[in-house]
């Protein structure tokens, strides 16, 4: 469960990075 949350946060950060760029 925690692993999934960490993965989601990682994807969210990547998506945010791409959006900011």
UniProtKB/Swiss-Prot annotation:
Modified residues (Serine amide): 21
One GO MF term: toxin activity
Main subcellular localisation: secreted
Keyword Cell membrane: no
Subcellular location: Secreted
Domain of life: Eukaryota
Tissues expressing this chain: Expressed by the venom gland.
Alphabetical UniProt keywords: Amidation, Secreted, Toxin
GO cellular component: extracellular region
Family: Belongs to the cationic peptide 04 (cupiennin) family. 09 subfamily.
Protein name (database record): Cupiennin-6c
Organism of this sequence: Cupiennius salei
């Amino acid at each position: 469960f925690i692993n999934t949350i960490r993965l989601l946060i990682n994807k969210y950060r990547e998506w945010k990075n791409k959006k900011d760029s």
